[in-house]
UniProtKB/Swiss-Prot annotation:
PROSITE patterns: G_PROTEIN_RECEP_F1_1, G_PROTEIN_RECEP_F1_2
Signal peptide range: none
Glycosylated residues in this chain: 130
GO terms of molecular function: G protein-coupled receptor activity; olfactory receptor activity
Residue intervals annotated with topology Extracellular: 10-40, 104-136, 201-210
Protein name (Swiss-Prot/TrEMBL): Olfactory receptor 1571
Origin: domain of life: Eukaryota
Gene (name only): Olr1571
Matching Gene3D superfamilies: Rhodopsin 7-helix transmembrane proteins
Protein source organism: Rattus norvegicus (Rat)
Higher taxonomy: Eukaryota, Metazoa, Chordata, Craniata, Vertebrata
Function of the molecule: Possible taste receptor.
Cysteine pairings via disulfide bonds: 37-119
Residue intervals on the Cytoplasmic side: 61-82, 159-180, 233-249
Length: 249
């Protein structure tokens, strides 16, 4: 259930921007309507934050599997998983609706040129002509609560996981426990490192093109890599990859 929702969120996250960009490249038309831009803002926030929430839920799932293996099926039952996924969807949908609705109050002086490959809310706020203080406050609190909250949960879960793995006496047991969460840890590291890269790029450079290129990583590359990273645990896929690389030309 968790994996299906994460894969669905990743597909929708990339679909929020790639189809429009492909059409623009084909038609050589870089214009997007106001309604289309607000729609991109809504879905971009929705599935981006949903990714964050689902990664936190999956971190808790790994924590229960490693730290409380005998109670795993009792704790992580289908009802709890369903409630966690539903809560993630409802919270992110309400947040996305609030922020995109707040974007409707922004006014722009002339035809707007966004130095980005997708309509991101922070770019719209920077280019607005009217008072953006309410938008800034909403974005700030959303980043702290909906971004920092799941991250804190992930860090806490992995601190407990590391402590449990260190307490295992056999090296084989440690390897088996680590392999249980290796894929999730790789996805989390990739997700937050690309977000950090975008933040640092926008903070220390004034070049909008470099910021746009950096944002491609977390909005396109990372969601496309996530299913592949998780599928590496599939023995059939690993066997096929080994046969492919061993095949002589």
């Amino acid at each position: 259930l968790l994996m299906c929702n994460l894969c669905f969120a990743d597909i929708c996250f990339t679909s929020a921007s790639i189809p429009t960009n492909l059409v623009n490249i084909q038609t050589k038309n870089k214009v997007i309507t106001y309604e289309g831009c607000i729609s991109q803002v809504y879905f971009f926030i929705l599935f981006g934050v949903l990714d964050n929430f689902l990664l936190a839920v999956m971190a808790y799932d790994r924590y229960v599997a490693i730290c409380h293996p005998l109670h795993y099926t009792v704790i992580m039952n289908r009802r709890l998983c369903g409630l966690l996924v539903l809560g993630s969807w409802v919270t992110t949908a309400l947040n996305s609706l609030l922020q995109s609705s707040m974007a409707l109050r922004l006014s722009f002086c002339t035809d707007l040129k966004i130095p980005h490959f997708v309509c991101e809310l922070n770019q719209l706020v920077l280019l607005a002509c009217n008072d953006t203080f309410p938008n800034d406050m909403v974005m700030y609190f959303a980043a702290v609560l909906l971004g920092g909250g799941p991250l804190a949960g992930i860090l806490y879960s992995y601190s407990k996981i590391v402590s449990s793995i260190r307490a295992i006496s056999s090296s084989q047991g440690k390897y088996k426990a680590f392999s249980t969460c290796a894929s999730h840890l790789s996805v989390v590291s990739l997700f937050y490192s690309t977000l950090l890269g975008v933040y640092l790029s926008s903070s220390f450079t004034q070049n909008s093109h470099s910021t746009a290129r950096a944002s491609v990583m977390y909005s396109v590359v990372t969601p496309m890599l996530n299913p592949f990273i998780y599928s590496l645990r599939n023995k059939d896929l690993m066997g096929a990859l080994r046969r492919l690389f061993r095949r002589k030309p």
